[in-house]
Amino acid sequence: MIYETAPAKINFTLDTLFKRDDGYHEIEMVMTTVDLNDRLSFEKRTDNKIVVDIEHNYVPNDNKNLAYKAADLMFERFNINEGVTISIDKDIPVSAGLAGGSADAAATMRGLNRLFGLGQSLDALAALGIQIGTDIPFCIYNQTAVCTGRGEQVTFLKRPPSAWVVLAKPNIGISSPDVFKALDLTEEHIVHNEKCKQALENNDYHLLCNSLSNRLEPVSMAMHPDIKKIKDNMLQCGADGALMSGSGPTVYGLAQKERQAKNIYNAVNGCCNEVYLVRLLG
């Protein structure tokens, strides 16, 4: 039995630069991890099947599951002639902008690499993982990084300063393709990628909070005004910085002090079913 942990990611920044010829958007984003995790275990089978064992109403256990897709890709690429049972204990909320599915897929690739003794480097796994998800290369490494291209170009950055994180996911679903479709690339915008990288380089917490920026945030907020209400609530209750992660709908607030973080948690807990008080990992 092999075990892997799959931490959630958050965006410090997210910029979309232009629409590529392959239909994807060219992006630049700074991401890190938080200590909200899914836990996965992997056990060999003798029947050559890939079986995903998960008890969750909104997560498929068939070939639509990203962990299944990752395993299928690994089996095909490395000619694996055995089976595997992938058990997922899920804490990361679904369709939240926290890369829960990608984190599970990345953990599956790392786990199968160990289970079957494939000897692949993390770089090799990341290069393979981009075939099934743009966040998977980042999730393979689980280190603070700036990701460019489709997400496959990963440049590591220093770990962020220590901080509490309050994550709040409203009870709405957001389709990432719909958000990108609604994005107007001609609109003026400011995303503070360089300021964010400087903040991490200098371990400057306040500069980091001032650099939080996401080009998709106003698009998702226009679709779902509750996202803005949660962000405003967090800032009014003392968050040092707040931002929507990914294409949403999860919003997070940063706080240096535990009491400050608990105040924010209590303020948003009444209006969101899924609220988490965690720490930055990086």
From Swiss-Prot:
Top enzyme class: transferase
Keywords in alphabetical order: ATP-binding, Kinase, Nucleotide-binding, Transferase
Active-site residues (renumbered): 9, 135
Bilayer-spanning residue ranges: none
Residues the record lists as binding ATP: 93-103
UniProt keyword annotation of Transcription present: no
Keyword Chaperone: no
Gene Ontology BP terms: terpenoid biosynthetic process
GO molecular function, one term: ATP binding
EC number(s) on file: 2.7.1.148
SUPFAM superfamilies xref list: GHMP Kinase, C-terminal domain, Ribosomal protein S5 domain 2-like
Function: Catalyzes the phosphorylation of the position 2 hydroxy group of 4-diphosphocytidyl-2C-methyl-D-erythritol.
Protein family membership: Belongs to the GHMP kinase family. IspE subfamily.
Name of the featured protein: Putative 4-diphosphocytidyl-2-C-methyl-D-erythritol kinase
Organism the protein comes from: Staphylococcus epidermidis (strain ATCC 35984 / DSM 28319 / BCRC 17069 / CCUG 31568 / BM 3577 / RP62A)
